[in-house]
Amino acid sequence: MAGSKQLVFNEEARKSLLAGVNKVADTVKITLGPKGRYVVIDKATSPIVTNDGVTIAKEIALHDKFENMGAKLVKEVAQKTQDKTGDGTTTATLLAQSMIVEGLKNITSGSNPIEVKKGIDAAVNASVGYIKTTSVPVKDRAKIVQVATISANNDEEIGTLISEAMEKVGYNGLISVEDAKSLETSLDVVKGMQFDRGFISPYMVTDNEKMVCEYEDCSILITDKKISSVKQMIPVLEMVASEGKPLLIIADDVEGEAQAALFLNIIRGALKVCAVKAPGYGDDRKAILEDIAILTGATVISEEKGMKIDGVTKRELGQAHVIRVDSEKTLIVGGRGEKKAVEDRMTLIQSQINIADSEYKKEELKKRLGNLGGGVAVIKVGAVTETELKEKKMRMDDALNATKAAVEEGVVVGGGITLFRAIESLDTLKFEDDRRVGVSIVKRALEEPIRQIAKNSGIEGAEVIAKIREHKNKHYGYNAKTGIYEDLMENGVIDPAKVVRIGLQNAGSIAGLILSTEVLITDFNDEKDQKSAAIII
């Protein structure tokens, strides 16, 4: 039988959601801009000092279950923005809060929630159109440095390193961020490849915050077989465990008792292992597995060759400097295969490209060639303390993701100016019903980033907005870093268009959802929960 449930309705439901939204957003928005503050998060090992919006938001859980629903919804804004762009989470959270606060005021005064939501959607779409039309493609190193520097909280060292990394491996190349063994932060290019297969289970994650599995000095078992028996795996697991080395398993699948045994030993801490399904299909899969084997110095354990997993020796395992696996992809850095073998394999693939009879086949072969020949830029981050290292790596990751977003969709003027100037594009939306309320809610929200950046810099937001409004130059704004009003685009204050666009869309989506909510339902715990005005069933 299901347990008791608590229900709240109408205005009370929306107020509870708003309280949760405000507690998350008020904590996160103090970090916005170059003068934003830091937040210290208590951890079991050592505290984390950060100004990263999504990292802060993820740590917040509220005692009141109804308020916690609102907190979870606005945390989703930050997380979705992070997942798609890697940056802009604070702005997205701030926009969502503003839309929800203004929306609830109007709905309480009698506006129709559904029509208000339609107005918000229309205004967000019009603003996105403006963002796309003002975007400038990224074609030079200076823009890369500017984007990366701003996303790294104005750390020019990080901006320069990311720019150099992109120069070495290309705009779409692979870039990895690792811990340095010294205090210095450095850049190196090593052999590596990436393929589109993630871990078979979250049990294998080593970093719960980033949801990735990462191991250094890792052995690699490659097979085209399904692994279902524990017995066939025991020899290879004992071999790597005796050396204290982690193991990456690339197989057709790992299932049944073999999978259960891996999970149990990972949880107990007896094994450091990650398993992924082999990339590709059919004959392509066999060829890709052979590519990985040559890059890492492994031998593919194949039934066609009469080989068995329980007979694997150390010689047949590949080796890599670092492996990093998330839910969607696997990155192998510093494969220790022989250089001559890799070159011979690339020559073979090139000859296959030359005689391929279809464009599809040529493209697939070119991808394989790029994977084998393309290096991975490794940025090794150094710091004096563990706390400083974590914070610096977070900023490095933010900057890297923002820079990739800038390469994809270009850049727009930063400092909140693009969103502010998008307000003019909403004047064309003429509605006679409550949709116009939704449009006015978005107009107000689009001012909030400037107001908050100004507030975090110790000046009045309304004063900054008034000065910006006086100027016809669409790039004119307040540079919070220098305290000067100037052309922000010319002076390198820019944002990736993709970050601004997705943050606004996610904020509008969650705001519309909360504003049209009428009922909240949550579990009722007789021992812990106090009876309130909520209905209990």
Curated annotation (Swiss-Prot):
<dbReference type="GO" id="GO:0016853">
    <property type="term" value="F:isomerase activity"/>
</dbReference>
<keyword id="KW-0963">Cytoplasm</keyword>
<dbReference type="GO" id="GO:0005524">
    <property type="term" value="F:ATP binding"/>
</dbReference>
<dbReference type="InterPro" id="IPR018370">
    <property type="entry name" value="Chaperonin_Cpn60_CS"/>
</dbReference>
<dbReference type="GO" id="GO:0051082">
    <property type="term" value="F:unfolded protein binding"/>
</dbReference>
<comment type="subunit">
    <text>Forms a cylinder of 14 subunits composed of two heptameric rings stacked back-to-back. Interacts with the co-chaperonin GroES.</text>
</comment>
<dbReference type="GO" id="GO:0042026">
    <property type="term" value="P:protein refolding"/>
</dbReference>
<dbReference type="InterPro" id="IPR027409">
    <property type="entry name" value="GroEL-like_apical_dom_sf"/>
</dbReference>
<feature type="binding site">
    <location>
        <begin position="87"/>
        <end position="91"/>
    </location>
    <ligand>
        <name>ATP</name>
    </ligand>
</feature>
<dbReference type="InterPro" id="IPR027413">
    <property type="entry name" value="GROEL-like_equatorial_sf"/>
</dbReference>
<keyword id="KW-0413">Isomerase</keyword>
<dbReference type="GO" id="GO:0005737">
    <property type="term" value="C:cytoplasm"/>
</dbReference>
<comment type="similarity">
    <text>Belongs to the chaperonin (HSP60) family.</text>
</comment>
<dbReference type="InterPro" id="IPR027410">
    <property type="entry name" value="TCP-1-like_intermed_sf"/>
</dbReference>
<dbReference type="Pfam" id="PF00118">
    <property type="entry name" value="Cpn60_TCP1"/>
</dbReference>
<keyword id="KW-0143">Chaperone</keyword>
<feature type="binding site">
    <location>
        <position position="495"/>
    </location>
    <ligand>
        <name>ATP</name>
    </ligand>
</feature>
<dbReference type="GO" id="GO:0140662">
    <property type="term" value="F:ATP-dependent protein folding chaperone"/>
</dbReference>
<comment type="function">
    <text>Together with its co-chaperonin GroES, plays an essential role in assisting protein folding. The GroEL-GroES system forms a nano-cage that allows encapsulation of the non-native substrate proteins and provides a physical environment optimized to promote and accelerate protein folding.</text>
</comment>
<protein>
    <recommendedName>
        <fullName>Chaperonin GroEL</fullName>
        <ecNumber>5.6.1.7</ecNumber>
    </recommendedName>
</protein>
<keyword id="KW-0067">ATP-binding</keyword>
<dbReference type="InterPro" id="IPR001844">
    <property type="entry name" value="Cpn60/GroEL"/>
</dbReference>
<feature type="binding site">
    <location>
        <begin position="31"/>
        <end position="34"/>
    </location>
    <ligand>
        <name>ATP</name>
    </ligand>
</feature>
<keyword id="KW-0547">Nucleotide-binding</keyword>
<dbReference type="InterPro" id="IPR002423">
    <property type="entry name" value="Cpn60/GroEL/TCP-1"/>
</dbReference>
<feature type="binding site">
    <location>
        <position position="415"/>
    </location>
    <ligand>
        <name>ATP</name>
    </ligand>
</feature>
